[in-house]
A protein has these predicted regions:
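Active-site proximal loop and beta-alpha junction motif in alpha/beta enzyme cores
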Residues: 1-79, 85-175
Length: 175
């Protein structure tokens, strides 16, 4: 990445306290970065996730949402909740989202598909504990895909614990 500069911000998600919560790095304009460079930057950030916003023309963003890619230090993810909420909040609160000042919803266009995130202020959170100054984000995730189930014995053997340490109340299943 010779002679290129990319701005990023680091947010503390799920908290109002600095240096608490779950940290997230967000590259605010990742145009020009290839997959390997995004992966290298995520590895350099060394956080659980790093997101890369790829701005598009306003008409496409209004129709398709904000293009965002999510990386861990090891690989790209099609979806993860923490970076989706954190990136959507950053867009909601910044001038990068050209329509965010007119709408309470930001749609992210991720590898997994489009994920709408709706924001509400305290006065709109009926039935929830009010916390001054907070904004609440809700996202509609895709339906889960349920995969293979595993026996308690198999899981106990793999993780090195006794079978009776695993509850038999619920199935053990890949989701």
């Amino acid at each position: 990445m010779p002679d290129r500069t990319y701005e990023f911000v680091q947010l503390d998600v799920f908290t109002q306290t600095a240096l608490a919560g779950n940290p997230l790095a967000i590259f605010t304009d990742a145009r020009g970065l290839n997959d390997a460079e995004m992966q290298a930057l995520a590895r350099e950030m060394n956080l659980s996730e790093t997101t890369f916003i790829l701005p598009r023309d306003p008409a496409t963003e209004a129709r398709e949402g904000k293009k965002v890619r999510i990386f861990t230090v090891e690989q790209e993810l099609p979806f993860a909740g923490h970076p989706t909420l954190g990136t959507a909040l950053h867009l909601y609160a910044s001038d990068l989202a050209s329509n965010s000042t007119k709408s309470d919803q930001i749609t992210l266009d991720l590898k997994a598909g489009k994920i709408p995130v709706r924001f509400t202020a305290n006065s709109e959170n009926a039935g929830r504990e009010r916390v001054d100054g907070q904004v609440f984000g809700e996202m509609r995730q895709h339906e889960p895909e349920f995969g293979t189930t595993f026996s308690r014995e198999e899981v106990a053997r793999v993780i090195g614990i006794a079978v009776d340490e695993i509850s038999s109340e619920w199935p053990i299943q890949a989701v």
